[in-house]
Regions:
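Catalytic phosphate-handling regions of large nucleic-acid enzymes and associated NTPases
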Residues: 1-165
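Conserved small/polar residues in nucleotide/adenosyl-binding loops
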Residues: 168-169
C-alpha cells in the first residue's frame, strides 16, 4: 500500500484536477456495494462511507491505497503499443489517449457524472451477462443482445416492462 497523498501527487503530475477532486475520486473508487459493484481501490484507513450526507474521510496523508487486481484489465496491455500517447498538460511526460481495457468497466460498474455540461448515468450490468453478450456479438453481428443482457443489475431486482430499449441507437 502507498500513502494516498503520494498517489494524489503522482496523479496531479499527469493532469492537474486538484488534490481534493483526485482524492475524493480515490475514496469513491474504494467504496464497495454502495458506489461500485467491483471497487478499483483497496484502501487502508478511514475512507468514509460512500453517499452519506457527511462523507467524512481522513486526509490523504493518513490513508493508504493501491489498485485492486481487476484494474490490470483496464491497462494491462498499455506497454504493447495498443494505444496512442500524447503529451500531458505541461509537456513533461506523456499519457495514453485512452485505456486499452479488456474489462467493460462502464457497463459493469456503472457511471454517474457531468462532462461538457451534460449529465450521464449508466446503470450497472451483470458481468457474466455482459461477457456472454460481447462474445455473442463478436461471433454474430446480428446477435440479439437482449437475449443475454436482460437489463441493469439492481441489487433489489427489477423487471423490464417493454422492449423499446432494444431499438434505441
Amino acid at each position: 500500500l502507498t500513502k494516498s497523498a503520494n498517489i494524489v501527487g503522482a496523479t496531479m503530475r499527469l493532469n492537474p484536477h486538484g488534490d481534493g477532486a483526485i482524492y475524493e475520486t480515490m475514496v469513491r473508487l474504494s467504496q464497495g456495494n454502495e458506489a461500485l459493484l467491483h471497487p478499483y481501490v483497496m484502501s487502508k484507513g478511514n475512507f468514509g462511507k460512500a453517499y452519506s450526507r457527511d462523507m467524512a474521510y481522513a486526509a490523504s496523508r493518513y490513508t493508504e491505497a493501491k489498485l485492486m487486481p481487476i484494474c490490470q484489465e483496464l491497462f494491462g496491455d498499455i506497454d504493447k503499443d495498443t494505444v496512442d500517447f500524447v503529451p500531458n498538460y505541461d509537456n513533461t511526460t506523456t499519457e495514453p489517449t485512452l485505456l486499452p481495457a479488456t474489462y467493460p468497466s462502464i457497463l459493469v460498474n456503472a457511471n454517474v457524472g457531468i462532462g461538457v455540461s451534460m449529465a450521464s448515468s449508466v446503470c450497472p450490468f451483470n458481468l457474466s451477462e455482459v461477457c456472454e453478450t460481447t462474445i455473442g456479438l463478436m461471433k454474430n453481428p446480428d446477435f440479439n443482445a437482449l437475449e443475454t443482457l436482460k437489463g441493469p443489475d439492481f441489487p433489489g431486482g427489477a423487471a423490464r416492462l417493454y422492449d423499446e430499449i432494444g431499438r434505441a441507437s
